[in-house]
A protein has these predicted regions:
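FMN-binding flavodoxin-like domain, especially the glycine-rich phosphate-binding loop
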Residues: 2-5, 15-18, 26, 30, ...
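Short polar catalytic/cofactor-binding loops
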Residues: 10-14
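Short acidic active-site motifs
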Residues: 40-45
Length: 147
């Protein structure tokens, strides 16, 4: 049976939407994927997917994006029942707290009984070749966890 992977993104500039698209392309041959903007996601339904990948930016100096706030608050009340997950996204090293939203989301997914299957990936603004390699590895780790 083909595994299902939900890719959830928050994007202000389009970077993270593009990252979500890149991940979908990496996963498409071996999994059913759905890309959804984070404000449209029901955190209580995450366990319906075999795995979840969150792609988020960090707003200002370490904040979650506004559009991710409701999702994040709901996530605090969800039992993910060992749903596999990975977190990645873009930020700016000019911020005091580079990629802190990635950290917040990773911590909350773990606290909600998720199973982290790949190291979180933080990207400084637009991805370069090394970043794409790390994203490809994240995708491969998610797929391997479902085998």
């Amino acid at each position: 049976m083909t595994p299902s992977i939900q890719i959830i993104f928050a994007s202000q500039t389009g970077r993270n939407r593009a990252i979500a698209g890149h991940l979908q392309a990496q996963l498409a041959s071996r999994a059913q994927t759905v890309i959804t903007e984070i404000s449209q996601v029901d955190a209580f339904a995450l366990t319906q997917a075999d795995a979840v990948i969150i792609v988020s930016y960090t707003y200002h100096d370490g904040d979650l994006p506004d559009e991710a706030q409701d999702f994040f608050e709901d996530l605090k009340e969800v039992d993910l029942k060992r749903t596999k997950f990975a977190v990645c996204g873009s930020s700016s090293k000019r911020h005091i707290h580079f990629g802190r939203a990635i950290d917040y989301l990773t911590i909350q997914f773990n606290s909600s009984n998720g199973e982290q299957v790949a190291d979180s990936v933080k990207i400084d603004q637009d991805p370069d070749d090394a970043d794409y390699q790390r994203l490809n590895q994240l995708a491969q780790n998610v797929l391997a966890s479902l085998a």
